[in-house]
Amino acid sequence: MMALYGKKDQEEHDTLDPIFGSLDEEQDLPKYQLNETPVEPRIAYQVIKDQLLDEGNARLNLATFCQTYMEPEATKLMSETLEKNAIDKSEYPRTAEIENRCVNMIASLWHASPDESYLGTSTVGSSEACMLGGMAMKFAWRNRAEKLGLDIKAKKPNLVISSGYQICWKKFCTYWDIEMRTVPMDMQHQSLDMERVMDYVDEYTIGIVGIMGITYTGRYDDIKKLDALVEEYNKHTDYKVYIHVDAASGGLYTPFMEPDIEWDFKLKNVVSINASGHKYGLVYPGIGWVLWRDKSFLPEELIFKVSYLGGEIPTMAINFSRSASQIIGQYYNFVRYGYKGFHEIHKRTHDVAVYLAKEIEKLGLFEIINDGSQLPIVCYKQKDDVKCKWTLYDLADRLAMTGWQVPAYPLPANLEDVEVQRIVVRGDFGMGMAHAF
């Protein structure tokens, strides 16, 4: 998430210290303005490296879903392709073909039908992928509604989603003037409440978002049940509603670990899916993917033809120029690991998560909210009947003193009084690190 910075964020000491023994030893470098003259490359390198010395260790950051390790060969390939602009497909046709292969591999994992014209694209991350999926839903809804004679200006269009949504959906609804209808979570329904979700749907609903890996807890929405509810609803109305699956976390994990779960394009009313390659696709940030089951669900007006890079290039993106290196990194992982390799990595991750959940539960202080048996996320709260003089926020601070970053936070709307702590187990977090933790 990009933060906003300005004058108020400047530090009181506004110069950088020079490097001992260098020719520039007496030259202070300003922090917030350009220096007047160049410095030697090694000076610039060392000054900046020194600024980063006291940052947290990314491997010990159990707050983030983002991948923090890749093999040296992958890193080498990515560093060798940093200068390639992914959007310039006529200049880099082999890179474009690699992106095409990745889309088709993911489509196969998500059971896209060869009888439908599925299509997809890479993105900067799942946030952009969600934006694209949301825009496609909005434009497709508008086209259908206008054909049916609905006054689309009479009310705001709306999007239905669990209150456990990731912040990108709030951004989407704000940026594109959509009413966000959130279905409250409770301790009984720690995912999308299937008993209530359809109460939020009407003729102005652009779509329903199901989540495969709720950010707060790691739980899955029951997409198969949601599909059945939508199917029944659509039988009795001309104003059809469809499902987008936000599988930022689960999209490149579930197919390898629980292939029998029905959540993807196997289900008739799931029309688009997004996933993060930089989560359980095992690539450094940032890379995401969004796919549609058929081109009929991606309105033509959202596809732009760009000719000024040489050749006419169709593009569906919010971002434009970006490095192709992350696409290359994703393809490396697909080639390197294959289906069995991804399964083995995720199985080890699963085993670590389950181990941690059991060990934390043995302490007798915590109630496990999510035990890592599906998505490898361990989430817990303090037991109501155990009196402690400390909070989960105190525990997070104490863990931070030893280098571990483990966030504590309240659950979303309707459960704000419940404070939890969450451990994200990634592919680079082995059993040895779990024992050390």
Regions found by a protein language model. Give the residues of each.
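Conserved PLP-enzyme active-site core in the AAT-like
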Residues: 6, 10-17, 121, 125-301, ...
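Surface-exposed helix-capping loop/turn segments at secondary-structure junctions
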Residues: 108-117, 143-149, 360-369
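N-terminal entrance/gating region of PLP-dependent enzymes' catalytic architecture
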Residues: 1-117, 403-406, 421
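Short Gly/Ser/Thr- and Asp/Glu-enriched loop/turn motifs at secondary-structure junctions
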Residues: 116-117, 154, 370-377, 416-420
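PLP-dependent enzyme catalytic core of the Aspartate aminotransferase-like
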Residues: 233, 415-437
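Active-site C-terminal subdomain of aminotransferase-like
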Residues: 256-375, 381-386
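Structured alpha-helical segments in the cores of large, soluble enzyme domains
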Residues: 99-106, 165-170, 193-201, 319, ...
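Conserved PLP-binding catalytic core of the aspartate aminotransferase-like
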Residues: 366-403, 427, 431
